[in-house]
């Protein structure tokens, strides 16, 4: 079963491909190594707050837009682990 969509998939399918922007061109434009963009696209690297600010500037969006997508993805991934993370914790 496929996991939920990643921020990198959104970046590639909804932004880079439709706008005909290569990963290398985006990397140059936002001042990061091409490998950083490629690893985000492949789901091997998270979008950090500094990267979210860069992406927001590049796509003329909120600074927090991409970070918000990353946080949502992180919480969806953790949903499977919720029981083990909260086992033995009693609410105050």
Where would I find each of the regions flagged by the language model?
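A short, Lys/Arg-rich alpha-helix, primarily the initiator
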Residues: 1-21, 68
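Short alpha-helical "recognition helix" segments of helix-turn-helix
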Residues: 24-27, 55
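Recognition helix of helix-turn-helix/homeodomain-like DNA-binding domains
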Residues: 31-47
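Short, basic-rich loop-to-helix N-cap that marks the start of a DNA-contacting helix
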Residues: 44-57
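Short, charged recognition helix plus adjacent turn
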Residues: 67-92
